[in-house]
Amino acid sequence: MAVGKNKRLSKGKKGLKKKVVDPFTRKDWFDIKAPSTFENRNVGKTLINRSTGLKNAADGLKGRVVEVSLADLQGSEDHSYRKIKLRVDEVQGKNLLTNFHGLDFTSDKLRSLVRKWQSLVEANVTVKTSDDYVLRVFAIAFTKRQANQIKKTTYAQSSKLREVRKKMIEIMQREVSNVTLAQLTSKLIPEVIGREIEKSTQTIFPLQNVHIRKVKLLKQPKFDLGALLALHGEGSTEEKGKKVNAGFKDVVLESV
């Protein structure tokens, strides 16, 4: 007798849909905290898979880089064309403590600065801060009309541009090498270095729209938890940092 399939038997349904599990149920949300250099310390939230077995969520969070508009950090639309990069260095509970990782301009702002009838001056320098962070700083500037000038164009001679560029590099090296990374951030917010360059180059050739357009972190020293906690107000729960005034001045200690 031949043995075959019994068509009367009910068949099991093929391709049964598996129970869909929402992937977000396996993830945790963490709050990103900016250093107290910025006025608004609440940057936003990020998520990661929960710690399971040998996999620790903190290891996956450390080193993450987030890009935030400086307008959000300072609560002012005047800074909307600048972007700040923050790097997660430490995890404390549900809070991620970050440090400054870089600065950049938005592309639309850079394009709006470039115009006809003027010369563009760019300079960059690699310099080490007093707390051993190696940075590459990029500056941009444009020539402007001299006093009582009738001529429409403001082009500068190559020799003048070389002098201006040399002065820009000299100022950037001086302003960055004598301060810590936190102090440099306080200088970048009100654009102290740009104003110093504009003031110092008046005798060579008048400039306008002088900006530090980019700061790139090349190398950082060994991680120091104490320094990071001090940068964040030693783990304080305050959600607001100290506002940086436009007339920023270095603090000089009279006595130690």
Swiss-Prot record:
InterPro entries: Ribosomal_eS1, Ribosomal_eS1_CS, Ribosomal_eS1_euk
Keyword Ribosomal protein among UniProt keywords: yes
A GO cellular-component term linked to this record: cytosolic small ribosomal subunit
GO BP term, example: translation
Keyword hit for Metal-binding: no
Compartment annotation: Cytoplasm
The entry's keywords: Acetylation, Cytoplasm, Ribonucleoprotein, Ribosomal protein
PANTHER family registered for this protein in UniProt: 40S RIBOSOMAL PROTEIN S3A
Listed name of the protein: Small ribosomal subunit protein eS1B
Species of provenance: Scheffersomyces stipitis (strain ATCC 58785 / CBS 6054 / NBRC 10063 / NRRL Y-11545)
Lineage of producing organism: Eukaryota, Fungi, Dikarya, Ascomycota, Saccharomycotina
